[in-house]
Swiss-Prot record:
Primary subcellular site in the record, as a coarse category: mitochondrion
Annotated organism of origin: Danio rerio (Zebrafish)
Protein name: Large ribosomal subunit protein uL4m
Biological-process GO terms, alphabetical: translation
InterPro entries for this protein: Ribosomal_uL4 (IPR002136), Ribosomal_uL4-like (IPR013005), Ribosomal_uL4_dom_sf (IPR023574)
UniProt entry keywords in alphabetical sequence: Mitochondrion, Ribonucleoprotein, Ribosomal protein
MF GO annotations: structural constituent of ribosome
Signal peptide: none
Length: 302
């Protein structure tokens, strides 16, 4: 009975795949929602960078381990709506190709939401509620239950026991290595999902927000885009274009964090931002090594 059922199910799957291949329809369930860049036309025409004839515009400045190879992606420009590739960019594998650890991502995300959280919930005890100083009735000869105050927790309008006594801080710290690893994992996940885009600069021809919206829609960058560049001063056109857009945000590379990466669908980095992130994140792997030659426990210095 089990073999017959397995054979029938197998034939059904093969039949569905054959019909979908002939008719051009998708064999996936209709209620399955996939990101548009995985099933769109632009993604189908996107060849792997390894087989490209375009020159390698950027090489990894830091030494790449012998057992690893640099990750590669396209270099694009924001000068036009068309996604013309200008070249190939090498990305350090220790930053953009680390193994995905969802537990670390979750730990960093929860920490980032809670380490500044303060709860101001506060309730009054029976000693703080107004009134209740007089005994409501005598102890005996009334037939009622004995009570000493109308502000007892047993009474309606009385004090609260074991209630919140704010302000309460939820502050705690994660180790620096865990936070750095979480940022590496988030960057690697964006690259693996084809959500990472490298541009030469943030110069756009017009400050019109519609131009940026059309560019994002034409290149199928998703519903939300995070643009990252170094420094605190950005081109005026990109600032004015993103000023009134809720789905396109721009931040400096120094403020890049796991929460912002998970909140936005696509990530756009400039070449200078890639250089800054690689230098900063790789530095954490070897920081204070001369001070700890015997591999002592990690410690931060002031």
């Amino acid at each position: 009975m089990f073999r017959a059922t397995l054979a029938i199910c197998g034939r059904t799957v093969v039949k569905r795949q054959f019909i979908s291949s002939v008719s051009g329809e998708s064999a996936l369930p209709p209620n399955l929602r996939l990101p548009p860049n995985l099933i769109g036309v632009a993604a189908e025409k996107r060849p792997p960078p390894s087989g490209s004839d375009l020159p390698v515009v950027r090489r990894c400045e830091a030494d790449v381990p012998a057992h690893l190879t640099p990750a590669q992606t396209w270099l694009e420009s924001l000068g036009s709506r068309d996604s013309d590739q200008l070249g190939v960019v090498d990305l350090h594998p220790d930053v953009f190709s680390v193994p995905i650890r969802l537990d670390i991502l979750h730990a960093v995300e929860v920490w980032q939401r809670n380490f500044k959280r303060i709860s101001y919930a506060n309730v009054k005890t029976r000693a703080e509620v107004r009134g209740g100083g007089r005994k409501p009735w005598q102890q005996k000869r009334t037939g009622r239950a004995r009570h000493g105050s109308i502000r007892s927790p047993l009474w309606r309008g009385g004090g609260i026991i074991h209630g919140p006594r704010g302000p309460t801080s939820y502050y705690y710290m994660l180790p620096m290595k865990v936070r750095v690893q979480g940022l590496k994992i988030a960057l690697s996940a964006k690259l693996a999902q084809d959500y990472l885009h490298i541009v030469d600069s943030l110069e756009i021809p017009t400050p019109d927000p519609q131009y940026l919206q059309d560019l994002v829609k034409h290149r199928q960058w998703g519903d939300s885009v995070l643009i990252v560049d170094v420094g605190e001063e950005f081109p005026q056109n990109i600032l004015k274009a993103t000023e009134d857009l809720k789905t396109v945000n721009i931040i400096p590379a120094l403020g890049l964090n796991v929460h912002s990466l998970l909140k936005h669908e696509s990530l756009v980095l400039t070449l200078e931002a890639v250089k800054f992130l690689e230098k900063k994140l790789l530095w954490h792997d070897v920081r204070y090594t001369p001070l700890y030659p015997f591999k002592l426990p990690y410690s931060d210095l002031p």
